[in-house]
Swiss-Prot record:
It holds the Pfam family Ribosomal_L32p. Residues 1-21 are annotated as: Disordered. HAMAP family: Ribosomal_bL32 (MF_00340). It comes from the Bacteria. It comes from Mesomycoplasma hyopneumoniae (strain 7448). This is Large ribosomal subunit protein bL32. Belongs to the bacterial ribosomal protein bL32 family. One of its GO terms (cellular component) is large ribosomal subunit. PANTHER family: 50S RIBOSOMAL PROTEIN L32, LARGE RIBOSOMAL SUBUNIT PROTEIN BL32. Keywords: Ribonucleoprotein, Ribosomal protein. The keyword Hydrolase does not apply.
Amino acid sequence: MAIVPKRKTSKQRKHKRQSHSALKLPNLVSCSNCANKKLPHHICQFCGFYKNRKIISFKAVNDKN
């Protein structure tokens, strides 16, 4: 035989238990070089700067038109 719960879990108890599993929005900051939104302590994906230094240089993509 399987184990059966002794009492029904109330909505309040269920919601209290699930309160820590909510998804959190990322904390975005603006880039000091290009003012686009980026994650803090990460290189800007638009300009390649981090702490006012150029870390990554992007190559220009040429269209075949």
